[in-house]
């Protein structure tokens, strides 16, 4: 029997994502000037105010205020009427040095034996539903949000858009787990004041269906995904009505509160650890990336149509406690899931330092992951320019 499955995404202007982006921008700034920096940076955003908290060990000083303000303005919070404006919001820093107890437990004479920065379990997931091996419901929800932000920043169409928005996509699956059709699309977007509420709702709905969705479909190159779009999709556009008050003024935002949006949209599993603001010595982030790297490559190689990989660590210990694999009965090789896990253990070095080297996680690459998902991204080389507290500028290919 067929079933329905939903995933949501949020825009870069969602308050929790504003916090994530500030935290990762600060992390990148540290890594640009000190690749050995240890960073655990949390951000809190609310009406007219940002608080930056956490623990850092680094040989460099960075201008937290400028980084936070530039991030907020890039997102689009540039008007006083939003009650949260990158030019005028208050910014308080409560950053302090990382615990010496943790440093002693993690650092080793032999760098390769660097211990995990914490205990925990991390998951990676992949499916062959899409070209980037992500669940199609989440992939579409992200695409809707990133395209809406693109339209907003162009400033030519849907000129009433404000930065905060959310999407949700419900997909119908066959009983053998094949996507069949899109059942429902939900889009809620912050907007300017309208003279009349009924006019507002009608206009936004019309523009979502006639401007946003055609552009979204135009970006999809996979015919199997395009076939999911039928004439019977149910659209819910701003279903609560007026959405003028939004962003950090409407809801307080915190780093690390969108971990399902950041990963697999409810598919697979999640170990509970957030990513943004953490350098790669924190296995919450680096091992989750490694688990995804393994799952994706296993599915891409045809080992299974779908795979979940779990890795767990003890603080201060380099090698993982376990590797677990679940192929959901969709394996294409004559091996049990346990045998696949044993093979993975031999093929991949999952010590934290080895993960850093393999995935190049000591580069300032994290700001790009802080909105629209950490997984399923297209590899690219990008030039990034950083300016130090002493006005020294450097450009890095990452």
Per-region residue spans from a language model:
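Internal helix-turn-beta structural module
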Residues: 46, 304-306, 313-398
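Glycine-rich, mobile lid/loop segments that gate access to catalytic sites or pores
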Residues: 6, 66, 73-244, 371, ...
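A short glycine-rich, hydrophobically flanked beta-strand micro-motif that places a catalytic Asp/Glu
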Residues: 37-41, 165-171, 233-237, 303-314
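Alpha-helical support elements that line or immediately flank enzyme active sites
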Residues: 12-31, 129-150, 278-302
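Conserved phosphate/anionic-ligand binding catalytic regions in large, soluble enzymes, centered on
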Residues: 8-10, 14-19, 115-130, 244-269, ...
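N-terminal, positively charged regions that mediate nucleic acid binding
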Residues: 1-40, 45
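Glycine-rich anion/phosphate-binding loop at the beta-strand->alpha-helix junction
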Residues: 196-298
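Short, charge-patterned binding micro-sites
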Residues: 40-58, 315-319
């Amino acid at each position: 029997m067929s079933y329905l499955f939903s995933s949501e995404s949020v825009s870069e202007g969602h308050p929790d994502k504003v916090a994530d982006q500030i935290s990762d921008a600060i992390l990148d700034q540290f890594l640009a000037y000190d690749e050995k920096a240890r960073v655990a940076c949390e951000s809190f955003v609310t009406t007219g105010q940002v608080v930056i908290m956490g623990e850092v060990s680094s040989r460099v000083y960075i201008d937290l205020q400028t980084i936070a303000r530039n991030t907020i303005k890039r997102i689009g919070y540039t008007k006083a009427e939003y009650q949260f404006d990158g030019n005028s919001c208050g910014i308080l820093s409560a950053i302090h040095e990382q615990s010496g107890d943790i440093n002693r437990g993690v650092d080793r004479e032999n760098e390769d034996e660097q211990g995990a920065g914490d205990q925990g379990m991390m998951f990676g997931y992949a499916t062959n539903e899409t070209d980037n091996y992500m669940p199609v419901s989440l992939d579409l929800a992200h695409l809707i949000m990133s395209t809406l932000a693109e339209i907003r920043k162009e400033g030519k169409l849907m000129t009433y858009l404000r930065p905060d928005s959310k999407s949700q996509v419900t997909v119908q699956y066959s009983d053998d787990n094949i996507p069949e059709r899109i059942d429902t699309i939900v889009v809620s977007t912050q907007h300017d004041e309208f003279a009349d509420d009924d006019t507002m709702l009608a206009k936004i709905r019309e523009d979502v269906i006639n401007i946003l969705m055609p552009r979204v479909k135009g970006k999809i190159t996979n015919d199997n995904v395009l076939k999911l779009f039928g004439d019977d999709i149910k659209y819910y556009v701003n279903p609560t009505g007026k959405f003028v008050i939004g962003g950090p003024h409407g809801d307080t935002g915190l780093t690390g509160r969108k971990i399902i949006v950041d990963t697999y949209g409810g598919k697979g599993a999640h170990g509970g650890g957030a990513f943004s603001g953490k350098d790669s010595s924190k296995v919450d982030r680096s091992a989750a990336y490694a688990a995804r790297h393994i799952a994706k490559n296993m599915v891409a190689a045809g080992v299974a149509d779908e795979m979940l990989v779990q890795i767990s660590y003890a603080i201060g210990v380099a090698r993982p406690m376990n590797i677990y694999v679940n192929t959901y009965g969709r394996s294409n090789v004559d091996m049990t899931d346990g045998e696949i896990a044993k093979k993975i253990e031999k093929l991949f070095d999952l010590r934290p330092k080895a993960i850093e080297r393999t995935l190049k996680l000591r580069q300032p690459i994290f700001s790009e992951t802080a909105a629209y998902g950490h997984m399923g991204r297209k590899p690219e080389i990008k030039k990034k320019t950083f300016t130090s507290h002493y006005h020294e500028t450097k450009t890095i290919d990452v």
